[in-house]
């Protein structure tokens, strides 16, 4: 159970692919102009990570070490092609919006990295969980960045959600404030870099506060009964 918890915590927070490893920044910065696009690509990446980790882990004993990387890429490309056709069939609007960034998941460092670092060494169940956790960590980072950019740039949230979830999702669109001219800095790549930098700073501050609390709690436990540690 502790190993399962560690895999989940590492994927979602401690070893977050976007905020700690800084992998996959090209789609992270390019696609997160809206929350819908960010969520769509994040979920697609999560599905690819889960399925590829599961497949590679299952076949790890039959994969020759000398040619393992080409085999990994072939498996990843097959899964990405299937996911691309799935999005094309059931979410065509999102497919058009994401464009080239769906097939580019094949070259995403996150996917290849987890295949080599985790799936090739661990069992199928734990590898699938690792892929799901890493994918959801990246999805959360993309969704937060996409939401911030959409709100600041357009004053809306979940604009175009029907492209991802169907026509019923039009009711999810929220207009937070009305603007006649979008704030282009937030919608263009410089805004993505600024937003990512703020998120990195925010995560660092949270980690430092959590570390300080753990240190203080450990110091209090180490003191004899009745002592407060004050001179």
Swiss-Prot record:
Chief place where the protein resides: membrane
Location in or out of the cell: Cell inner membrane
Transmembrane segments annotated in the record for this chain: 18-38, 39-59, 63-83, 86-106, 125-145, 182-202
Organism: Escherichia coli O127:H6 (strain E2348/69 / EPEC)
Topology relative to the membrane: Multi-pass membrane protein
Entry keywords, A to Z: Cell inner membrane, Cell membrane, Electron transport, Membrane, Translocase, Transmembrane, Transmembrane helix, Transport
GO cellular component: plasma membrane
Entry EC number(s): 7.-.-.-
Quaternary structure, from the entry: The complex is composed of six subunits: RsxA, RsxB, RsxC, RsxD, RsxE and RsxG.
Keyword Transport attributed: yes
Stored InterPro entries: NqrDE/RnfAE, RnfE
UniProt GO BP: electron transport chain
Protein name listed in UniProt: Ion-translocating oxidoreductase complex subunit E
Family recorded in the similarity comment: Belongs to the NqrDE/RnfAE family.
Top-level taxon: Bacteria
Function, as annotated: Part of a membrane-bound complex that couples electron transfer with translocation of ions across the membrane. Required to maintain the reduced state of SoxR.
């Amino acid at each position: 159970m502790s190993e399962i918890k560690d895999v989940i915590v590492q994927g979602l927070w401690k070893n977050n692919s976007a905020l700690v490893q800084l992998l996959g920044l090209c789609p992270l910065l390019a696609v997160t102009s809206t929350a819908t696009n960010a969520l769509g690509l994040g979920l697609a990446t999560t599905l690819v990570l889960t399925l590829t980790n599961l497949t590679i882990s299952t076949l790890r004993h039959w994969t020759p070490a000398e040619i393992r990387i080409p085999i990994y890429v072939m498996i990843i490309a097959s899964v990405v092609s299937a996911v691309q056709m799935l999005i094309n069939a059931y979410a065509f609007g999102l497919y058009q919006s994401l464009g080239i960034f769906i097939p580019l998941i094949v070259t995403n460092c996150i996917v290849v990295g987890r295949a080599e670092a985790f799936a090739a060494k661990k069992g199928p169940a734990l590898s699938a969980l690792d892929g799901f956790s890493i994918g959801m960590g990246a999805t959360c980072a993309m969704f937060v960045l996409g939401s911030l950019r959409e709100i600041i740039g357009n004053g809306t949230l979940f604009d175009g959600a029907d492209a991802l979830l169907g026509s019923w999702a039009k009711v999810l669109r929220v207009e937070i404030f009305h603007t006649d001219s979008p704030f282009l800095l937030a919608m263009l790549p410089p805004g993505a870099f600024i937003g990512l930098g703020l998120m990195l700073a925010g995560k660092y501050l949270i980690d430092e506060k959590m570390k300080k609390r753990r240190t203080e709690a450990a110091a209090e436990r180490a003191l004899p009964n009745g002592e407060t540690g004050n001179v």
